[in-house]
Amino acid sequence: MYPHLTSIGIEQPEAIERYSLRQEAANDILKVYFAKNKGELFAKSVKFKFPRQRKSVLVNSGSREYKEITEINRTLTHIIDELDIITKRKHTEVDIKKKILGDLRHLERVVSHKISEIEADLEKLK
């Protein structure tokens, strides 16, 4: 399902919680964090180093001046796409759970208030 993550040795992509990406010299450093298991103090993480691709870009066509630039490795782009799918899906699930819990708490308050109102009306009848 996640061929690029599998190709770099990640056997359980569903356990990924988040990731970070930074540039260091001529490399991009990808750090993948996994969900913390019960009893662990720190979450497990793995680090990958991807060399940036170098390109010569024409700056001035009149003088035929070129400038060397670097850009993200194509493989890393595919890996990030897969990581985004995994992490966004988890965030969506968490957001839905928060919404449901919020709705439930609101319903509890409404019902509690209504019960108090009915009890007050009953007291008036005595």
Swiss-Prot record:
TM region positions: none
Pfam families in the record: DUF3461 (PF11944)
Top-rank taxon: Bacteria
Family per similarity comment: Belongs to the UPF0325 family.
Protein name: UPF0325 protein PBPRA2971
Organism field: Photobacterium profundum (strain SS9)
